[in-house]
From Swiss-Prot:
SUPFAM superfamilies, A to Z: P-loop containing nucleoside triphosphate hydrolases
Modification sites for Phosphothreonine: T438, T466, T810
Keywords: Chromatin regulator, Chromosome, Developmental protein, Nucleus, Phosphoprotein
Function: Required for underreplication of DNA, which is found in many late replicating euchromatic regions of salivary gland polytene chromosomes. Functions by promoting the localization and retention of Rif1 to active DNA replication forks where Rif1 inhibits replication fork progression. Controls chromatin organization in polytene chromosomes.
Organism: Drosophila melanogaster
Chief location: nucleus
Region (Disordered): 351-419, 454-474, 502-591, 660-711, 777-802, 825-900, 913-962
Protein name in the entry: Protein suppressor of underreplication
Molecular function per GO: ATP binding; chromatin binding
Length: 962
């Protein structure tokens, strides 16, 4: 019995008079029978109760079983939400499980004088009736499964008509979740105590926080459910609330899809048997036809999905197919035997592919086609050929099916048929007679040949025929009823008219709805083709003629029909579908073929391999890591000025620290000159370790945080302007230049091994000339201070360790640190080791350049003009004071920074060490450090650069610039 499974459950006797027979109990679960007992106990006492089981536990079946136990003379009203699916679900359960007479209240004329036991009514119908005093009911039940009590109109109507009279409330939603809902429910059932007559008093007692506040965690969840517990305790005596997880073994009672199928089968069978009054049938049909998406499971299963339009129609119409085929279509079944080849048929509505093995099967059992057939068959009474061309055309437009052979076979069949069968719709003939032999073309020609002027008139007639069933509705149905003498045709007409119009609309998306029905054009073309074609040539000539004749006056979209016809003429081949598929991928843009740009739910085309993937549309993603790892001049975490390269060997090695005056600078201003860019103070470094030449030597970047020096810089400084960025592959590493040493040559040789060295950059040309001028002094200084020069790595292992320790000692001895403001000119302070802060005069800032350049680095490296004794703190302070008082300061302050640097450099070189003051000015002014003030790296790197262990000579010179 549909999805209800018999379990041989014995009958349940509720009382001496009330008995739930085994016919009903065998289809119910034990927990449903428990609910029947619970509700009946209170119903017998005229007490209010709430059936509040969770959705899916079969509340409607429970109530149906309960109603079957009540005396038949008792009249029960069930008030529903305004939902056709709920109404159908109630009718289904009451009719399937019980023998009760059910009546649907629809208007003022309805009364309770009829011999019915159960009355179903939507609350909107009751509200429209107004005065319900003349309707006498013994029991009143309210179904809140559609949240009807959330509607203020429904609640007010129920309270006005039935306050205190409701016996059973059916609800899937927990009534304790809303205080207002529970208050109204208790009023309907007459269970509200006198002290809570007003909602304000009830709310004060059982107030629940707003769920929004609970979800936003402004209110404790435990407190919220504690309050809900108070409400549950208040109504526990007359409420039954159970949950799905308690009965997992028995659930689901039925699969949602199976329930939908059974519901539609029942609905179709009831309509075909005419067991319900005509008004009920029509209302049911109208509701299904107008609200196909609302055929939802109700009663037992309230959580099912919405039905699709086509599935409803197909399932609901299935019984009608068999009846109808028995009456009129039998003569047709004899014809198809001529050519029995399986034909691939695509239904225009569902786009479902059905492969019927033989024509008789296609005729009767096909759920999709036969209902449509019947409706149209009844409508097309005059000329079957015209209809055939019309309908097949629309279908051809949609799916490119095998339409031409069916057409001819249809005509062949129609020749032998009676006038009654001649009215059959082409669609059913196409499906059923797909495998028929080729028809005689004579009938075809006569039927379809028409001048071009006639199709308009025929279109009008066809419009009238096809549209009238939908518009006129019942009159057409009655006419059809007279023809077929069965109520099923009424349903068929409803469905089929609706669906036929849908087909036409779909087949002509670019035209107006009225034009959609003007399919006779296709008949014109077919007529022209067929007269020309002979019996033997029918298929190929149609293929050739259709495009040739119809091209001139065809609207856009028509050629597609001809092409599909051409392709379809191969009888049993499925090529029409395969040819129909390729256009789909063409819609996809090339870039969409890559997985990165596939849109959601976009189908991958079948001919994906044939489509070229347009690489130019895919944005180029630059490689990030490889260059960072390979090039010695690229930057990782630190830049040149921050790295001390230490060999991995135990032999003492002299560590060379290289600083780029260009590395740490902020993004260059195009208005600045090249020398200004080179000499401008640099910002705090953030770049990488390998940017020093140590990467070329294979030295590790150990102690990177402690090694900062502003005095030396590399030529490949432009890379470091973008810290931690991907290096430009076009700018190779050139190596580092150090004045007064051979490190430059050594590094450049190493760099040339890895990367070809381009010509010297133009922005350093002036400094390079000066470097070449004083090359002999560099060599001489190299001899005097051999520690600066790097030897081969194997011979330098121990020197590196001693150099590092030397630097650490100088850090403790160093007293002065300089604090600058974010790498800009001005805002400097001096901080000594004791914590004393002394400001620097602003005019001093103009005197001192922001950072040492190559010229001063060369001077420092040569060591010719430097003092041989390390000054004490007091000596350093006096030097600074003398520098501030120097008569050169204001003059040089007035000059530009570049002129000052060059002038001081030449003065220091050619003036020699004439006086300590001039020496200090020439050296200290241009080499005011930036990084040295920030960390211990300053003194360490200076000591290393000046020779490390060579003595205080170098250290004194470097520490003047703190």
């Amino acid at each position: 019995m549909y999805h209800f499974v018999s379990e041989q459950t014995p009958e349940v006797r509720l009382t001496d008079e009330a008995l739930v027979t085994s016919h009903v109990t065998q289809y119910l679960k034990s927990f449903q029978l428990d609910a029947v007992r619970f509700v009946y106990d209170r119903l017998a006492k005229r007490e209010f109760c709430i059936l509040n089981d969770e959705s899916g536990l079969g509340k409607v079946a429970t109530v149906a079983a309960l109603l079957s136990a009540l005396p038949p003379a008792k009249k029960t009203l069930v008030v529903l939400q305004n939902d056709e699916q709920l109404l159908t679900g109630w009718r289904f359960h009451l009719d399937t499980l019980t023998d009760l007479q059910v009546y649907i209240i629809q208007g003022v004329q309805d009364t309770t004088d009829s011999p019915h036991s159960v009355y179903l009514a939507k609350w909107s119908q009751l509200r429209s009736i107004g005065d319900l005093s003349r309707l006498k009911f013994d029991y009143i039940m309210v179904d809140n499964r559609g949240h009807s009590l959330n509607n203020s109109f429904c609640t007010s109507m129920l309270l006005k008509q039935f306050e205190g009279r409701v016996n059973v409330l059916i609800s899937s939603v927990d009534v304790t979740s809303d205080v207002r809902l529970l208050y109204n429910v208790l009023r309907l059932g007459g269970r509200l105590e006198h002290q809570y007559k007003s909602f304000a008093s009830f709310d004060r007692k059982f107030h629940l926080p707003d769920p929004k506040e609970v979800f936003s965690k402004r209110i404790d969840l435990e407190e919220y459910y504690k309050q809900r517990g108070f409400l549950s305790e208040y109504i526990k005596d007359f409420r039954l609330r159970r949950f799905r997880h308690q009965f997992d073994k028995s659930l689901p009672l039925v699969a949602p899809e199976q329930y939908k199928h059974n519901l539609n089968l029942w609905l179709a069978s009831k309509n075909s048997q005419s067991t319900i009054s005509g008004s009920d049938v029509c209302s049911t049909i109208a509701s299904i036809d107008n609200n196909p998406a609302q055929q939802n499971k109700t009663g037992l299963f309230e959580e099912t999905d919405r039905l699709s339009e086509h599935s409803v129609d197909d399932v609901a119409m299935s019984p009608l197919i068999f009846e109808y085929s028995e009456s009129d279509d039998e003569p047709l079944t004899v014809e198809p035997d001529a050519d029995q080849n399986p034909v691939l048929v695509v239904s225009s509505d569902d786009c479902e592919i059905v492969t019927p093995p033989s024509t008789p099967q296609n005729r009767t059992p096909s759920l999709n086609e036969s209902p449509r057939t019947k409706s149209k068959k009844k409508f097309s009474k005059k000329t079957s050929p015209r209809k055939k061309a019309d309908l097949t055309d629309s279908e051809e437009d949609d799916e490119a099916t095998d339409n031409m052979p069916p057409r001819k076979r249809t005509r062949a069949a129609t020749v032998h048929l009676t006038p009654k069968t001649r009215r059959l719709n082409v669609r059913i003939l196409r499906v059923s007679l797909d495998t028929l032999s080729t028809p005689p073309p004579s009938r075809t020609t006569t039927a379809i040949v028409t001048p071009k002027t006639e199709p308009t008139a025929r279109r009008k007639n066809l419009k009238k025929r096809t549209v009238s069933p939908v518009d006129v509705g019942r009159p057409a149905t009655r006419g059809m009823q007279r023809l077929t003498r069965s109520a099923e045709t009424k349903i068929n007409s409803k469905y089929l008219k609706h669906r036929s119009l849908d087909d036409v609309k779909r087949s002509f998306p670019r035209r107006v709805k009225l034009e959609g029905n003007q399919t006779p054009r296709s008949s014109k073309q077919i007529v022209k083709q067929e007269p020309k074609s002979k019996v033997g040539q029918e298929k190929k000539q149609k293929t050739v003629d259709v495009p040739a004749q119809g091209t001139a006056k065809r609207k856009p979209g028509r050629p597609r029909k001809c092409q599909t016809k051409t392709e379809d003429l191969g009888k049993t081949k499925t090529k029409p579908n395969s040819k129909h598929l390729p256009p789909t991928p063409q819609v996809l843009s090339g870039s969409s073929l890559s997985s990165e740009y596939m849109q959601c739910a976009q189908r991958i085309p079948d001919n994906l391999d044939a489509i070229e993937s347009p690489a130019f549309r895919v944005p180029f993603t630059p490689q990030q890591t490889p260059m960072l790892l390979t090039l010695p001049s690229t930057h990782n975490l630190l830049n040149d000025s921050e790295v001390v390269s230490i060999p991995l060997y135990k032999d003492p090695v002299e560590t060379v620290v290289i600083n780029s005056s260009h590395d740490e600078c902020s993004p260059q201003d195009p208005s600045q000159s090249r020398r200004t860019k080179a000499l401008k103070r640099k910002r705090k470094p953030v770049t990488s370790v390998n940017s020093s030449f140590g990467g070329g030597l294979g030295l590790p970047p150990a102690k990177r945080s402690a090694n900062k020096s502003p005095d030396l810089f590399s030529i490949s400084s432009e890379h470091s302007q973008i810290p931690l960025a991907q290096p430009r592959p076009s700018s190779p590493f050139e190596g580092f230049k150090i004045f007064g040493s051979e490190v430059k040559q050594f590094q450049q040789q190493l760099a040339k091994v890895n990367i070809s060295v381009p010509k010297k950059k133009r922005d350093r040309s002036c400094l390079d000339i000066l470097e070449q001028m004083f090359e002999p002094r560099q060599q001489q200084s190299a001899k005097t201070s051999p520690k600066v020069l790097p030897t081969l790595p194997l011979t330098q292992k121990d020197d590196a360790e001693s150099t590092i320790t030397q630097r650490r000692r100088t850090l403790l001895e160093d007293d002065f640190f300089e604090i600058t403001n974010n790498g800009q000119f001005g805002s400097r302070m001096r901080l000594n080791s004791s914590g004393e802060v002394s400001p620097v005069q602003p005019d001093q800032q103009s005197v001192r350049p922001s950072q040492a350049n190559k010229i001063t680095n060369y001077l420092i490296g040569s060591g010719i003009t430097q003092e041989r004794t390390q000054p004490s703190n007091g000596n350093r302070n006096s030097i600074l004071a003398s520098l501030r008082k120097s008569p050169k300061s204001p003059k040089q302050g007035a000059k530009s920074t570049q002129a000052t640097k060059l002038t001081r450099w030449f003065g220091s070189v050619f003036g020699g060490g004439a006086s300590q003051t001039s020496s200090v000015e020439s050296v200290s002014a241009p080499s005011t450090p930036v990084n040295s003030s920030t960390s211990a790296a300053a003194c360490q790197t200076r000591s290393a650069r000046s020779g490390g262990a060579s003595g205080p000579t170098k250290r004194k010179r470097l520490e003047l610039f703190k």
